[in-house]
Regions:
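Positively charged n-region of N-terminal signal peptides that target proteins for export
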Residues: 1-4
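Divalent-metal-activated hydrolytic enzyme cores
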Residues: 22-76, 99, 110-128, 142-229
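Conserved beta-strand elements of the Class I
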Residues: 80-82, 103
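Catalytic core of membrane glycerolipid acyltransferases/transacylases, capturing the structured
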Residues: 88-105
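Conserved functional hotspot residues or short segments at active or partner-binding sites
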Residues: 135
């Protein structure tokens, strides 16, 4: 498995060598990356990146001035990440990726409960051609904590109360069971994945092996992501 991962990373590194390329050539080469990495290979890239982060050995790729200029002509991310808005979950750092590598959708409780977020997800897959979607929940999620607590009712401004109520729909079996927070966070991740699977167009891509959807659980304490099937 390690040989496979190394091979994938070498291929990615070779493909991302754009010195001397025009903007059009750069765009073509980035598209070429998407065409040559399948969903499982992209997942291995993210797993390896997370190992770098956990062991404080981030490579910090694609963060220089050249990369910034390369991305002006268009974006070609390799994966879509649905994550919580929590400032303690720095998605690109967690997976050791740089500018233009990931299409990130961040909402409270990593929730996909409106047209804006689902539309963003569909855009990433249908127009940017990302082949992997990972929905990442995290340890001690404040949104899910509030959603399963019965002590927050009536104490928050209207907008926050509406947000909590929306999140509560995704963790209904755990309302009033604050001691089950981790279980609720995992359950919520699965509920968001189920929403994705209800989209027939995305489901067709999954069935054809052109798109992979998985869950993740991020540990605040050590930076590790548990990849959930």
């Amino acid at each position: 498995m390690k040989k496979v991962i190394v091979g994938v990373l070498m291929m990615v590194g070779a493909m991302w060598s754009f010195t001397g390329c025009t903007s059009n050539q750069i765009s073509q080469k980035e598209t070429h990356i998407q065409e040559n990495l399948n969903p499982n290979q992209i997942l291995e890239v993210l797993k390896t990146g997370n190992e770098h982060f956990v062991h404080h050995k981030n490579a910090f790729p694609h963060l220089d001035e050249a990369r910034m200029k390369e991305e002006v002509s268009g974006q070609h991310p390799i994966a879509t990440v649905v994550s919580c808005s929590d400032s303690r979950v720095p998605v690109e750092l967690v997976f050791d990726r740089g500018i233009g590598d990931l299409f990130v959708i961040r909402t409270a409780g990593n929730s996909l409960d409106d047209d804006m977020t689902m539309g963003s997800l569909e855009y990433a897959v249908n127009h940017l051609h990302t082949k992997l979607i990972i929905v990442v929940g995290h340890e001690k999620c404040g949104g899910i904590t509030a959603a399963i607590s019965q002590h927050s009712e009536g104490k928050e401004p209207k907008e926050i109360s509406n947000l909590i109520e929306t999140l509560r729909k995704g963790v209904e079996p755990f309302v009033g069971k604050s001691e089950k927070l981790d279980d609720a966070i995992h359950y919520n991740v699965d509920q968001q994945i189920q929403k994705i699977l209800q989209n027939q167009e995305l489901k067709d891509l999954i069935d054809k092996g052109e798109l992979k959807v998985i869950g993740g659980y991020y540990h605040l304490s050590d930076g590790k992501v548990d990849f959930l099937n």
